[in-house]
Amino acid sequence: MDNQTPSELIDAKLAGLGDWRGATLARLRALIHEADPEVAESVKWRKVSNPLGVPVWEHSGIICTGEVYRDKVKLTFACGASLGDPNGLFNASLDGNTRRAIDIPEGGSIDAEAFKALIREAVALNMVKKQPKR
């Protein structure tokens, strides 16, 4: 398992779920790649209780993480509080100063175009934050 690439680890996590959560996270993953073909996948926070870790999508910093719970799939945006979210996709972690999240329950859906726009906005924010200070 340690010789696997991050993308292979994410593939294994999705395959191992084998239910609606895996299908939902796979769809969100595809939308992230559609929105930003240069996105890099990584896996963070691997531990005994979660050996495949948490999928992370990055471009000039973390865009979002994909967490799986019994009753939902959660996409947490690292700098979500700084994003406009004109379509109101954020529905969790709304009180924090930094992060925002989208919880998708079984049978739930997401507006694909609005989600891709949110991904592109997060990438643009990361790129501005990475510019050297003068």
Spans of model-derived segments:
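Charge-dense, helix-prone N-terminal extensions
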Residues: M1-R134
